[in-house]
């Protein structure tokens, strides 16, 4: 790209450094990649859009970084004799599928401050820089910490998180299936007591308490955040341990089922046989306790 177009320029005429980062969200950002996991990516740059590259075939900085992003996606989604390398999901970028492929750092901040929904801040908890400019990475981390730790009204946050969880339940859970199916099966990821409940508990805790406990912003993965919640005595040692072990057990079960090309929905008999029911019940108990209005402090 630079051989063809030159290097993007800063406002002072100095070449960028390259002022571009790739941010991983979801399982990639949370260091929890599994078999068949896709890549949730967001591309950010910090070069003036009104300026251009310094090559003979000069193009606008914004166009340059968009083409870089397109090239990266093309390489990551390459098909080989063994199948596709990865699936790439860009929907977590500002404004989702209708947004720019590459967002400026200033634009990212404005969006998160003025337009982003609470669920987008939940997603940001699992975001980390994968590669790119060290300078822009530092600025992104600063923005992430600032956004996640902004003051929030406890009851409003609780209702927004519960509302989003309810929407996920409507789409993915057995709650819309026949009553008999609901009673006799358990979806390891989306049903009550599953992985999403644990993730939402952790995300809620970060948004709720990080203003006063910046230690919660150190990590993007659920396990280490739960360890910090225990250290800060925001969660009891017993509850934090239950959630960590439940998360690991459920993720491990999904990995095995994926390798066997089986769905991540088990009969309750299988759930008992795999030793997962005690984790399911513990997660439901902690979820209920966490989201009780009178439990907020």
What is each of the regions a protein language model found here?
Residues 1-297:
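A nucleotide- and high-energy phosphate-metabolite-utilizing enzyme signature
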